[in-house]
Structure formats: C-alpha cells, structure tokens
Amino acid sequence: MSESRTSADGGMETSYGFREVPGGEKQGLVNQVFHKVAKRYDIMNDVMSMGMHRVWKDAMIAALNPRKEPGYKVLDVAGGTGDIAFRIVEASGRQAHATVLDINGSMLGVGAERAEKKKLSANLTFVEANAEELPFEAASFDAYTIAFGIRNVPRIDVALAEAYRVLKRGGRLLVLEFSEVDMPLLDKIYDAWSFNAIPQFGKAITGDAEPYQYLVESIRKFPNQENFAAMIRQAGFSRVSHTNYTGGIAALHSGWKL
C-alpha cells in the first residue's frame, strides 16, 4: 500500500498536498518547502499543532524509554533540527548516540548549530541522505524514530522497508505523525484552523503562506491510523500499535523488528 499511483502515461504519480505530481518531482518540491522554513521550523510546528507538538514529542520519548547505557544507537529520520534527537540523548542520561538523518541540508545546519549550543555534539551525528536509501549497514540501530516527516517521503513503503532493514533484531520503530481526528466537533474546529488560520499565520511569520498550505494539505492526504498501521505491518514489523494524541490530531505508531 503506497501513496504512489500509475499515471495515464505509465509513469508513477504521487501526492504533493492536493496536487498529483510525477513521483520524481515530489522530493524537490518538499525540499523547497523546508529550505524556506528551516530557521522557523519549531515555530511552524507550534502553529500546525497549536503548541501541542512539544507534549506529543515528550510522550514519544517516554514511549521509547531510551536505555541509559553506552552503545544504545538511535536513527532519527527527517530530524534535521534535532528536536527529537536532543530529547533522546537527554532521556538516556547522555548515554545514547543519535544519528540525525535529513535530506535537507538547511534543516541539518540548524540542528548542528543547536547541538553545539546544547553541548550535545559528542552524542550526535548529522547525515544528509534520503529516507528511501539509508546509507547504513543492515541491523545498525536499536531504534528508528521519525516525527512529522514520513508524510513528506515520496515512497512511504520504501522508507518503512529501509527502517526495517537498518534496525537490529528486537529494535523498535516509532512514527509520530499528524493523523485523522476521531472526534467530529474537534475535526471541524481543526479543519477550520488548518485551512484558514495556519496559512495566514505562516505568511505572517515567514512572509510566505505556500509552505504552510502544502503542509496542511499533506496531512489530509496521509493514510489514517489503521491504513498506516497496515503499511507498517507490510514492511515486516510485528506488535504494531498506535496511540492517538489530542483526539487523533496526531498519532504515535509503534512496531518491532522481531
């Protein structure tokens, strides 16, 4: 189950927000979005989540419960600014090593600068690479995390297969992503916020509404909780589950390589 689909001319198309684009074009378009918002990425998440992303990320780290021992290795994908990786390292008592992978160099630059300021550089490695082609040996990591990034990957099924490959046996996948609201009243409120307020706030903050319009649309195009859980199972993961946050505005998906 992939979000890619065959176009009339036989090529592959995928969604870029509400638009259908050739599969090979999506990554470049997404890169442009994140180059524009890199310096204000955390503010962007505050706008997108009404400030709740910080609570959800803390809950994600609590679920991971990183081991407080040397040699514990985590791969944080699409984590350029370091927000998740910093939390992992701190939660491990600065014992864990987190590899932060992102396809966007602007985001990684922000993360590396923040790591220096937090004096966490010794526990972090920053890698510019594609989630669909991870530059690591099989069975390299104890955990794989990705927060609000999987929906921007052109071929989600390929990224999940790569996650499975690089995890050690007994390793865990955790995916935090905006999802399908399961409360009718909240759904209407969040829809109004998303399509009316978020692009305008984005324009006020960055001078450009377009990146925020894409991000709102990409949330609506992402598979719902049950369908995404099915994709995780198809990638080979076991004990797949999800936990809704704030009525399903976001969901934390978990799977194990057993």
Curated annotation (Swiss-Prot):
Top-level lineage group: Bacteria
EC number: 2.1.1.163, 2.1.1.201
Keyword line: Menaquinone biosynthesis, Methyltransferase, S-adenosyl-L-methionine, Transferase, Ubiquinone biosynthesis
CDD domains: AdoMet_MTases
Chain segments carrying region Disordered: 1-20
Binding annotation for S-adenosyl-L-methionine: T81, D102, N130, A131
Enzyme class: transferase
SUPFAM superfamilies reported in the protein's UniProt record: S-adenosyl-L-methionine-dependent methyltransferases (SSF53335)
Family: Belongs to the class I-like SAM-binding methyltransferase superfamily. MenG/UbiE family.
Role description: Methyltransferase required for the conversion of demethylmenaquinol (DMKH2) to menaquinol (MKH2) and the conversion of 2-polyprenyl-6-methoxy-1,4-benzoquinol (DDMQH2) to 2-polyprenyl-3-methyl-6-methoxy-1,4-benzoquinol (DMQH2).
UniProt-recorded name of the protein: Ubiquinone/menaquinone biosynthesis C-methyltransferase UbiE
Gene this protein is translated from: ubiE
